[in-house]
C-alpha cells in the first residue's frame, strides 16, 4: 500500500519510526512544505539523514485567507502519485474544508484520508467551558484562550473539525484522550487509533547495554535531570524554583538541565540569584545518545515541569521515575501516579518540590518506580509497537 504522509518537517526522532513503517511493508512518501513556513517549533532538531527507506517530495506553501498555511501543490501531487492513503494533520487538513476541488480529487482516486493529531487543546464538541479549566498558552507562555474573538474562533473551529472528521476514514492519535474527545464530533470509536509517541527505542536499548558496561561519568549523588528545549512553556523556571526548596532538604542534590534555547540566559540568571550555581549544571544540547544516555542512567529522577516531549520516554527507558504535570495528554499514557512517578499540580513549585523530595528520600521506592517505567517502554510504547499501530490503521482503512 502507498501512503503519502504530510508533515511540517521530519523531526530527528521521527526518522527511525518512518523507517520502521517502511520495513513493515508500506510504501511511504513524505510530503513537506518548501522552506521555513513558521510551523516548526523553536529549536526542534530536524533529521538530516540521506539514507531513507521512504521518499521525500516537497510542495510550495502559502498562508491562506483563513490564516493558516496550505500546500499549494497538494492536488497535483496526489494526481501524480495516486496514493492509497493520505495521512495529514493540522493545519493542512483545513484545505479539505475550504478547497472543494481537493475533496473531489481524493474522492475520484478513492484515496483514503487519515487525520493525525494528539489531539491537543481540543475540547469536546460544544464545550467552550473547557478552556476555563484548560487555558491555552503559546511557547512563550502568553495566554491565547481569552476574549470574544478567541471564543468565536474556537466555536467555528469545532464545526470545521466536525465536518473534517466526516471526510476521514480513520484518525491516528498520540494519546488516549482521543477516545474521550473525538466521539463528541461523531467519530466512530473503532476508527480511532492511538499510536502513542516514541523515539528510537531500538537505539536507546542498544545504548543502554553499552552504558551499563561503562565506568561512571558523574559523581554518585542524588541527581535530578531535565532534558528539553529551553523555551518558556517547558517551565524550567518552576523546576529551578522547586530545586531551591529541595536543596534545603537534600544538600548534596544536583540538578542537570540538558538543552538549548532562547531562555538559557534568564534561567542561568535565576540560578545565580537563588545561589544555586554550585548545584545546577547547564550542559547545553547533547546529541550523542551515549553521552545523553549516561546522564540519564546516572540520575535519580526525571522532571518535566511544563509541556511534554519524548524525553519522558527516554528517561523511562533508563529506568527513571518521572515527575511531571498533566499538559498535552501524552504523559498520562506514560506515567501512572504513584506507580512509576508522580503528577504535580501544574504551575506549583511547592508541590513539585514535595514530589521530588518524596522520591529522592526513598531510594527503594524510586528504584521500584524506575523499573515500572522501563517495563512500560519495553512492553507498550516503543518503535515496534508504535509502527505496528500505524500499520493497523492503514489496514483498517484499506479494508473499508
Model-identified regions with their sequence ranges:
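Short acidic/histidine- and often glycine-rich active-site loop of Leloir-type glycosyltransferases
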Residues: 313-317, 327-343
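Conserved acidic donor-binding segment of nucleotide-sugar-dependent glycosyltransferases
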Residues: 337-338, 342-349, 358-364
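Conserved donor-binding/catalytic core segment of Leloir-type glycosyltransferases
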Residues: 4, 216-234, 240-243, 256
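Acidic donor-binding loop of glycosyltransferase active sites
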Residues: 294-307, 320-321
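Nucleotide-activated donor-binding/catalytic signature segment of Leloir-type glycosyltransferases, i.e.
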Residues: 265-286
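Donor nucleotide-sugar binding/catalytic pocket of nucleotide-sugar-dependent glycosyltransferases
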Residues: 150-211, 219, 314
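A short, well-ordered alpha-helix in the C-terminal region of glycosyltransferases
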Residues: 252, 351, 358, 365-380, ...
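Short alpha-helical donor nucleotide-sugar binding micro-motif in glycosyltransferases
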Residues: 285, 292-299, 315-316
Amino acid at each position: 500500500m502507498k501512503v503519502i504522509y504530510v508533515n511540517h518537517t521530519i523531526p530527528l526522532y521521527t526518522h527511525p519510526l518512518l523507517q520502521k513503517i517502511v520495513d513493515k511493508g508500506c510504501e511511504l512518501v513524505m510530503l513537506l512544505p518548501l522552506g521555513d513556513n513558521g510551523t516548526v517549533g523553536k529549536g526542534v532538531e530536524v533529521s538530516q539523514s540521506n539514507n531513507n527507506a521512504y521518499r521525500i517530495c516537497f510542495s510550495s506553501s502559502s498562508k491562506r485567507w483563513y490564516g493558516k498555511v496550505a500546500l499549494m501543490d497538494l492536488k497535483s501531487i496526489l494526481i501524480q502519485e495516486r496514493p492509497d492513503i493520505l495521512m495529514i494533520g493540522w493545519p493542512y487538513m483545513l484545505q479539505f474544508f475550504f478547497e472543494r476541488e481537493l475533496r473531489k480529487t481524493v474522492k475520484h482516486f478513492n484515496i483514503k484520508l487519515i487525520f493525525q493529531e494528539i489531539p491537543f487543546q481540543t475540547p469536546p464538541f460544544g464545550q467552550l467551558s473547557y478552556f476555563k479549566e484548560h487555558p491555552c498558552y503559546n511557547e512563550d507562555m502568553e495566554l491565547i484562550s481569552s476574549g470574544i474573538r478567541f471564543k468565536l474562533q474556537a466555536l467555528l473551529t469545532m464545526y470545521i473539525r466536525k465536518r473534517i472528521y466526516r471526510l476521514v476514514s480513520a484518525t491516528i492519535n498520540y494519546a488516549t484522550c482521543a477516545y474521550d474527545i473525538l466521539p463528541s464530533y461523531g467519530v466512530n470509536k473503532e476508527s480511532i487509533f492511538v499510536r502513542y509517541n516514541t523515539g528510537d527505542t531500538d537505539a536507546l536499548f542498544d545504548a543502554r547495554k553499552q552504558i551499563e558496561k561503562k565506568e561512571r561519568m558523574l559523581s554518585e549523588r542524588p541527581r535530578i535531570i531535565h532534558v528539553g528545549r529551553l523555551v518558556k512553556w517547558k517551565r524550567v523556571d518552576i523546576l529551578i524554583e522547586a530545586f531551591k526548596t529541595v536543596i534545603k532538604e537534600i544538600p548534596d542534590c544536583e540538578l542537570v538541565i540538558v538543552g538549548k534555547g532562547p531562555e538559557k540566559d534568564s534561567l542561568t540568571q535565576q540560578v545565580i540569584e537563588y545561589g544555586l550555581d554550585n548545584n545546577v549544571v547547564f550542559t547545553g544540547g547533547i546529541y550523542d545518545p551515549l553521552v545523553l544516555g549516561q546522564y540519564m542512567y546516572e540520575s535519580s529522577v526525571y522532571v518535566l515541569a511544563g509541556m511534554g516531549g519524548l524525553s519522558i520516554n527516554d528517561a523511562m527507558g533508563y529506568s527513571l521515575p518521572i515527575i511531571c504535570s498533566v499538559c498535552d495528554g501524552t504523559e498520562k499514557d506514560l506515567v501512572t501516579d504513584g506507580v512509576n512517578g508522580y503528577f504535580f499540580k501544574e504551575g506549583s513549585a511547592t508541590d513539585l518540590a514535595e514530589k521530588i523530595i518524596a522520591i529522592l528520600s526513598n531510594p527503594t521506592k524510586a528504584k521500584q518506580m524506575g523499573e515500572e517505567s522501563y517495563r512500560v517502554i519495553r512492553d507498550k510504547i516503543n518503535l515496534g509497537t508504535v509502527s505496528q499501530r500505524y500499520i493497523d490503521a492503514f489496514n483498517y482503512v484499506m479494508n473499508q
